[in-house]
Amino acid sequence: MPKVGMQPIRRQQLIEATLQAVDQVGMGDASIALIARLAGVSNGIISHYFQDKNGLIAATMRYLMSVLSENVTARRQALADSSPRAHLQVIIEGNFDASQVNGPAMKTWLAFWATSMHQPSLHRLQRINDHRLYSNLCCEFRRVLPLEDARTAARGLAALIDGLWLRGALSGDAFDTAQAQQIAYEYMDFQLAKQVS
């Protein structure tokens, strides 16, 4: 008989083991057996909680997306300045937070992006993540720019964030998040300078 309250603990344990496995061997070679071994549980536990490896990968991505969302939300709620610039700045910072640019997270995101092109459930998660970033950026730009300009600025900043993140993840060097953020801030300020008085 399972212990009461173990499900959330086991699920998190398996998600963390998945991040570790993808970091060590990549998503393709991150087998159920390896993940279970890293988590210190039997293979059957993964099937019990997630059905299969795809279910576990989807849960791991939902976890990373949740951490990103919670981080950005907390930063926005802590703002003393309610200007669009302040909100855009913390959205940028949240996307380059240590929770998103550590080795296991970066390798899992990269593998997720590649796999999402072939798996509908993961593609859906990718679209949700893309839309969330675009929507948050567009909402803030819309406070000072006409609708079409706000949409264009949001698309550009979202693409820049993703591109800077991708280059940082693939560089093989330590990710210079300060430089990435500065480049994104400069684009943000360029767009905000178009503000209609």
Curated annotation (Swiss-Prot):
Repressor involved in the biosynthesis of the osmoprotectant glycine betaine. It represses transcription of the choline transporter BetT and the genes of BetAB involved in the synthesis of glycine betaine. Residues 31-50 bind DNA. It comes from Pseudomonas fluorescens (strain Pf0-1). InterPro entries: BetI_C (IPR039538), DNA-bd_HTH_TetR-type_CS (IPR023772), Homeodomain-like_sf (IPR009057), HTH-type_TetR-like_transc_reg (IPR050109), HTH_TetR (IPR001647), Tet_transcr_reg_TetR-rel_C_sf (IPR036271), Tscrpt_rep_BetI (IPR017757). Transmembrane segments: none annotated. Signal peptide: none annotated. One of its GO terms (biological process) is glycine betaine biosynthetic process from choline. GO terms for molecular function: DNA-binding transcription factor activity; transcription cis-regulatory region binding. Gene3D superfamilies: Tetracycline Repressor, domain 2. Residues 8-68 form the HTH tetR-type domain. Pathway: Amine and polyamine biosynthesis; betaine biosynthesis via choline pathway [regulation]. Keywords: DNA-binding, Repressor, Transcription, Transcription regulation. The lineage of its organism: Bacteria, Pseudomonadati, Pseudomonadota, Gammaproteobacteria, Pseudomonadales. This is HTH-type transcriptional regulator BetI. PROSITE patterns: HTH_TETR_1, HTH_TETR_2.
